[in-house]
From Swiss-Prot:
NCBIfam families: mscL, PRK00567.1-4, PRK13952.1. It is a multi-pass membrane protein. Keywords: Cell inner membrane, Cell membrane, Ion channel, Ion transport, Membrane, Transmembrane, Transmembrane helix, Transport. This is Large-conductance mechanosensitive channel. The keyword Transmembrane applies. It comes from Bartonella bacilliformis (strain ATCC 35685 / KC583 / Herrer 020/F12,63). GO terms for molecular function: mechanosensitive monoatomic ion channel activity. Channel that opens in response to stretch forces in the membrane lipid bilayer. May participate in the regulation of osmotic pressure changes within the cell. HAMAP family: MscL. Pfam families: MscL. The chain crosses the membrane at residues 15-35, 38-58, 80-100. Homopentamer.
Length: 138
């Protein structure tokens, strides 16, 4: 049973998946930082200094100035957080699209290099002549 588990755990796909998950988690932190520290301030500047993370609609109670106070007072719709996550998703999707596109291009080039070139008609004819001459000598 231990041998079977070892075979399962050391399969190429399992190791590739583990590496992918670890890289994905590190990549997620990097993308979150890019979105929160670079893109959101620029978007806030373009929109007049709006802080998306503090945007909300209070559904119950008196109007509060901050999201935290509004959540303590009752139900709120935190649409600013949704906007931030939507922008985050779009940026991640955009980056992944270009990564996959680049990887596909590299894979395609590698397949083209590995693929043997088809022989020209002259080459085929010369090969046939060589084979016929070799058969006549035997």
């Amino acid at each position: 049973m231990l041998k079977e588990f070892k075979q399962f755990a050391l399969k190429g796909n399992m190791v590739d998946l583990a590496v992918g998950v670890i890289i994905g988690s590190a990549f997620g932190g990097l993308v979150n930082s890019v979105v929160n520290d670079i893109f959101m301030p620029i978007i806030g500047l373009i929109t007049g200094g709006i802080d998306f993370s503090n945007m909300f609609i209070q559904l119950a109670g008196d109007k509060k100035a901050t999201l935290l106070a509004a959540k303590e007072a009752g139900a709120t719709l935190s649409y600013g957080n949704f906007i931030t996550l939507l922008i985050n998703f779009l940026i991640i999707s955009w980056i992944l699209f270009f990564l996959v596109k680049g990887m596909n291009k590299m894979t395609q080039k590698q397949e083209e290099v590995e693929k043997p070139k088809e022989m020209s008609p002259e080459g085929k004819l010369l090969t046939e002549i060589r084979d016929l001459l070799a058969a006549q000598k035997e």
